[in-house]
């Protein structure tokens, strides 16, 4: 019910942008207090295809979730670091900037379309957010309730913030935890899982996260609490995995999905899919075949947008 109301309000904003924002904020604040979703769109991909066009196509199916700004981050295995491209305004601005993704090379990445909650609509506040030297790059849907406390603690450690967002606090906190695990004899995956585990314990609020680590090309991480997130298991032709805030984003590429549960973490590569609980214990999750087409998925399986 909440999801359908939320989509209806997003539709109203698209049709009547001058008059719907106040209604939207009333409803979205209620949803946040009661564990519902905050509207932003997340897409991620790792596989054998070029990631940027896939990310942008997926985001076009999630644009009802936000059109204040959009961005993508893509890693080319031959490049020294992750490339981040962001644009203020509707997704078409980002598509023009990147030649519909063709100008950004690499087979692993994350994308985001934003409806502003903390920080004004701007390129600086757009996702993805990144740490120094892009050691950690992160997209987020939700609200980090204790972001100010985290921000102040990180500033005392010498971290410098570029944006006004709660998401950057989560990104730099994850970077801090990841850095602390260096030299401890852990594998890169173990370090990442430990850092994400600590983040999930420290952060209060709702979140769905898509994460890239600069020293792990081709690996895509995801985690969630009280904000929706799925894994798409791509066809042999695409040979890889996706993440998304909602089913429509992946239906152009696969009908097979895994629903990430609350307090769960996903680690994805082109060939492997691992799901963990918050204690970093690997768990089995069923693959669900979506029977709807893309148009029906946008209505969550219902016949109409309105009841």
Task: Set out the residue ranges of the language-model regions.
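Basic polycationic patches enriched in arginine
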Residues: 4-7, 21-22, 33
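Conserved short alpha-helical segments that host acidic/polar catalytic motifs at enzyme active sites
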Residues: 29-304
């Amino acid at each position: 019910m909440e999801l359908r109301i939320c989509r209806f309000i997003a539709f109203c904003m698209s049709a009547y942008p001058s008059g719907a924002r106040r209604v939207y904020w009333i409803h979205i604040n209620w949803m946040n207090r009661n564990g519902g979703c905050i509207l932003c769109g997340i897409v991620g991909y790792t596989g054998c295809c070029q990631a940027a066009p896939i990310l942008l196509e997926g985001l076009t199916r999630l644009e009802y979730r936000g059109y204040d700004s959009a961005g993508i981050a893509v890693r080319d295995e031959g490049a020294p670091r992750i490339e981040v491209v962001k644009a203020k305004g509707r997704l078409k601005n980002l598509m023009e900037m990147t030649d519909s993704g063709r100008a950004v090379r690499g087979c692993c990445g994350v994308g985001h379309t934003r409806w502003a909650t903390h920080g004004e609509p701007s390129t600086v506040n757009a996702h993805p957010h990144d740490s120094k030297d892009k050691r950690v790059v992160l997209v987020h849907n939700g609200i980090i309730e204790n972001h100010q406390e985290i921000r102040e603690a990180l500033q005392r450690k010498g971290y410098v913030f570029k944006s006004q967002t709660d998401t950057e606090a989560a990104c730099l906190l994850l970077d801090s935890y990841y850095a602390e695990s260096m030299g401890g004899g852990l594998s890169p995956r173990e370090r990442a899982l430990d850092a994400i585990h600590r983040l999930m314990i420290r952060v209060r609020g709702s979140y769905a996260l898509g994460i890239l680590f600069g020293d792990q090309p081709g690996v895509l991480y995801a985690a969630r609490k009280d904000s929706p997130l799925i894994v798409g298991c791509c066809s042999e032709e695409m040979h890889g995995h996706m993440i998304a805030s909602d089913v429509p984003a992946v239906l152009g590429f696969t009908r097979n999905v895994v629903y990430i549960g609350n307090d769960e973490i996903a680690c994805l590569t082109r060939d492997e899919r691992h799901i963990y609980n918050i204690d970093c214990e690997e768990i089995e999750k069923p693959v669900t075949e979506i029977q709807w087409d893309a148009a029906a998925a946008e209505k969550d399986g219902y016949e109409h947008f309105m009841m």
